[in-house]
Amino acid sequence: MLNCDMLIDSKELKSTISKLKNEDNYTILLDVTAVDYLKFPDVTPSRFAVIYILRDSTFTKEITIKSYVDDNTLEIDSLYDLYESADWAERETFDQYGIKFVGHPNLKRVLNHHQFIGHPLRKDYKITKGQICTETEDLMDEMVPKLKSKGYKKEEIDDLMLLNVGPSHPASHGTIRNFVAMEGETITACVTEIGYLHRGFEKACEHHTYSQIIPYTDRLNYCSAILNNIGYSKAVEEMLGIEITPRAKMIRVIIGELSRILDHLVCNAANMVDLGGLTNFWYLFSPRDMAYDLLSKLTGARLTNTYTRIGGLEFDLYDGFDKDLEEVLKAVEKGVEDALSLIAHNRIYHDRTQDVGVIKADFALRNGISGPNLRAAGVACDLRKDKPYYGYENFDFDVVIGSHGDVYDRMMCRFEEMRQSTKIIRQAMKNLPDGAINVYAPGVILPSKKDVYGNIEGLMNQFKLTFEGIQVPKGEYYSFSEAANGELGFFIVSDGSGRPYKVKCRPPCFYSLAAYSKIVEGTMLADAVVTMASMNFIAGEFDR
């Protein structure tokens, strides 16, 4: 969608969105962000606007809403009582822009540390201004109110054991700190702190050309980097009104689904280790290593591939790719079968995963959870089916869903999704068309070396694209794709230049992790560990 669908006065925002939710079934809040128009070429009613992105209950329609904020107060009503997913989303917007959400129960920083001064995504904040954190926050300002809301008195709180799980703990699967209060082995309250891997992705995007941002997207979910490349490139291409070639679409499907398999292999393999099943880990990591060899041969890198280009791809498939790919797919299928054979009738595995870390469907939707974590709760939401792109509507594959939303269902959904991805890849290879991998668009695609050295037009085009970047039409746009962990979205604002005015990434992990503390409260600490592993939090993605 180019430009926002609705412009709402801030005084009417809450009532209007409440109506959209209750009458028009826009029951999912996908994301919240803000735009600082301080240096925008057009005149705007005020400096800051807050952006809300909603999706309806059929998963087929989304709407982008803008509301300008009073420059004197910088206040706007919180939507937390309408959507639980507004919690961390509004905290992030406050953290990055200084917008105050009136009525939010815990409006404090979430990505930047507690000693940080200022708001880094404001246009008058210099990107070179670093700020060091010198002491750890004890998080008692969140823990004590949470315990009191559960009926604990001060003297009872003093008797609880307070424990930090992370940020540097093997079970945290990344730089996540969970501060828990415990009675025996049971978690009574949990406070999650993130930001340890925050690199300022969105601030960096504002200082680079559209093409230079692609390597940064690799570092979001580094377990399936190419899916990030695809999601970002797709967003910019849609802003440009470009449709990539049929061959490029099919190759993106092939490599994207292979990346999905890699992500699921890592998730389930790591979960097996937490459960004590090291043999299963090697069964799943062996085909992963084969796939990395294939990607290295294709893209020149094993992990951070930077494979897509705006308008196409960096390289075409090499000779013999089809044979190498089939070997990888067979290895994946064997690894999955071998791992499953060890746990299918394993009593210990069933006891550790069934009815553990349960996520109900309505809870998942209220909290903005998507992807396998949502499907495991019984909700058949997959953007490849609901909002198909790149010809996904022409592929024969099933949307895998669970029935209980527990650790067992989440793992089994990922195992079966790997099978479905191999099915998609084989269909795509069978129907792979010939032709170019990049569109013919001199203002988008770099010219060949022959043209650069052979004629002045090619030389000038190469110079302008390299130094000035692709000139994207002025506008505001939200694009999405079905990444390995759920809906990966990019909200981009263009001022018509070769650098984006704003880029906001909607990381699926961010919303799953925001809900994690509510899921594990009342469970055993050991169960909280396997719950975390089964939800597949990637620090590079939620911290950005």
Curated annotation (Swiss-Prot):
Q: Where in the cell is it found?
A: Cell inner membrane
Q: Per the annotation, which location comes first and is thus the protein's main one?
A: membrane
Q: What class of enzyme is it?
A: translocase
The record lists the catalysed reaction(s) as: a quinone + NADH + 5 H(+)(in) = a quinol + NAD(+) + 4 H(+)(out)
The record's keywords, sorted A to Z, are: Cell inner membrane, Cell membrane, Membrane, Multifunctional enzyme, NAD, Quinone, Translocase, Transport, Ubiquinone
Region annotation NADH dehydrogenase I subunit D: where it falls in the sequence: 161-544
The annotated region (NADH dehydrogenase I subunit C) lies at 1-138
What is the membrane topology noted in the UniProt record heading this document? Peripheral membrane protein
EC numbers on record: 7.1.1.-
Pfam short name (any one): Complex1_49kDa
Q: Which domain of life is it from?
A: Bacteria
PANTHER family, per the entry: NADH DEHYDROGENASE [UBIQUINONE] IRON-SULFUR PROTEIN 2, MITOCHONDRIAL, NADH-UBIQUINONE OXIDOREDUCTASE 49 KDA SUBUNIT
Record note on quaternary structure = NDH-1 is composed of 13 different subunits. Subunits NuoB, CD, E, F, and G constitute the peripheral sector of the complex.
This chain's function reads: NDH-1 shuttles electrons from NADH, via FMN and iron-sulfur (Fe-S) centers, to quinones in the respiratory chain. The immediate electron acceptor for the enzyme in this species is believed to be ubiquinone. Couples the redox reaction to proton translocation (for every two electrons transferred, four hydrogen ions are translocated across the cytoplasmic membrane), and thus conserves the redox energy in a proton gradient.
- Protein name from the UniProt record: NADH-quinone oxidoreductase subunit C/D
